[in-house]
Swiss-Prot record:
It comes from Picrophilus torridus (strain ATCC 700027 / DSM 9790 / JCM 10055 / NBRC 100828 / KAW 2/3). Heterodimer of LeuC and LeuD. Catalyzes the isomerization between 2-isopropylmalate and 3-isopropylmalate, via the formation of 2-isopropylmaleate. GO terms for biological process: L-leucine biosynthetic process. It is an enzyme of class 4 (lyase). Pathway: Amino-acid biosynthesis; L-leucine biosynthesis; L-leucine from 3-methyl-2-oxobutanoate: step 2/4. This is 3-isopropylmalate dehydratase large subunit. Its EC number is 4.2.1.33.
Length: 413
């Protein structure tokens, strides 16, 4: 009896793969960005392979648009490579944050095996595929071979049941899962999510949860495909295969979560597993940030805009909203969400990873405090080492921007 992940590795390797086995598996796609791509390209060139262009996806996103000469050099290097070898390529204004683009453009689909040279490649498990973060050198090898060795991961089954309370979303659920198991608590395992609560969550919320399995050290994430999954991919691809766990599949452990008990939550410095109900936190803030591969989708921006409509942010707070892709940006324009946000005093930017990694466009100065929808709040993550980052869902971030301190949306409405 096998888990879905064991079945996928079996099919992709041609072996009877079980957790703990080492296999060489064929990948459907390998993805790099402007930061990880240059090293992958160097490795590929050194090996002298012929590229498997139809399986290579190049998506500049971390320092986009380039913030300085060095980042411009990196951008040019990955673009030149993509154009030379006719790979999939999403340039400025046509793509966005790599993980969002991989989902939007149909690269992620049930049953696929994908490697990405970025730690949050786990995100695509929301669509019932196996997606893993790898190193740049490994990506360069895959450019020419289409294969990679894997240790088949054990599966932690996270059973989440109960109807979430109003204002509780995927971000709050995954923060509470992290609080339960700790950072690194699922190291090199697959975190599979099941239970009645998943039925209430749209693909956006599942993506948020899958994204932050990285913070638990997980090798990958997995959600079973359902009608919401198929609706999401319907106009993107028809090439997929649905895998499910056998009834008597073996799990490394089973963790039960009652979603009905979860409150809107915030992760306080300096760890994503350091979680409190938002009602217990009230620190003053300097910046509020809505965006990233974790919570920069149109659903997130809509929810923030509902809180901000006809209101003004605190005079001492800067609010930044950064959509996860050009598609999200365009949709926000069409729906009038950009006007709502800027009328409230917020700044609506083009798509980039930027501030999430302390790169640019929202970097924090000494002693500053930010509440953010991103995925990490380690020391110095978004700027100066003395700055502080709190993690929360978009509604909480929007409400906090208005109040000038960490606040619940209930205080606004």
């Amino acid at each position: 009896m096998k888990t879905a992940v064991e079945k996928i590795f079996s099919d992709k390797s041609g072996n009877d793969a079980r957790a703990g086995d080492y296999v060489i598996a064929n990948l459907d796609y390998v993805m790099v960005n402007d930061i990880t791509g240059p090293i992958a390209i160097d490795a590929f060139n050194e090996l002298g392979y012929k590229p498997l262009s139809d399986r290579i996806v190049v998506i500049p996103d971390h320092f986009v648009p380039p913030k300085d000469i060095n980042s411009a050099i990196q951008y040019k290097k990955v673009k030149d490579f993509a154009l030379k070898h006719n790979t999939h390529f999403y340039d400025l204004g046509r793509g966005g944050v790599c993980h969002q683009v991989m989902m939007e453009k149909g690269f992620a689909a049930p049953g696929r095996l994908i490697a990405g040279a970025d730690s949050h490649t786990n995100t695509y498990g929301a669509l019932s595929c196996v997606s893993v973060g790898i190193g740049s050198t490994e990506a360069g090898v895959i450019f020419g071979t289409g294969r990679m060795w894997f240790k088949v991961p054990e599966t932690d089954l996270i059973r989440i049941n109960g109807r979430p309370k109003k204002g509780v979303y995927g971000k709050d659920i995954i923060l509470n899962v992290l609080s339960r198991i700790g950072n690194g608590g699922s190291a090199y395992k697959c975190m599979e999510f099941t239970g009645s609560t998943i039925d209430y969550l749209d693909i956006n919320e599942r993506m948020t949860m899958a994204n932050m399995t990285t913070e638990a050290g997980a090798k990958c994430s997995f959600f079973n495909a359902d009608e919401k999954t198929l609706d999401y991919i319907r106009n993107k691809t028809n090439d997929y295969k649905i895998y499910k766990d056998d009834e008597n599949a073996e799990y490394s452990r089973i963790i039960d979560i009652d979603a009905s008990e979860i409150e809107p939550s915030v992760a306080i410095p300096n760890s994503p597993d350091n979680v409190r109900p938002v009602s217990k936190v009230s620190e003053r803030i300097d910046q509020a940030y809505i965006g990233s591969c974790t919570n920069g989708r149109i659903e997130d921006i809509r929810r923030a805009a509902l809180i901000l409509k006809d209101k003004k942010i605190d005079k001492n707070v800067r609010l930044m909203v950064v959509p996860a892709s050009q598609e999200v940006y365009n949709q926000a324009l069409k729906e009038g969400l950009v006007d709502i946000i800027t009328d409230a005093g917020g700044y609506f930017a083009g798509t980039t990873c930027g501030a999430c990694l302390g790169g640019y466009m929202g970097v924090l100065g000494p002693g500053e405090t930010c509440i953010s929808t991103t995925n990490r709040n380690f020391i110095g993550r978004m700027g100066d080492r003395t700055s502080r980052v709190y993690l929360a869902n978009p509604e909480v971030v929007a409400a906090s921007a208005i109040m000038g301190r960490i606040a619940s949306p209930e205080e606004i409405q």
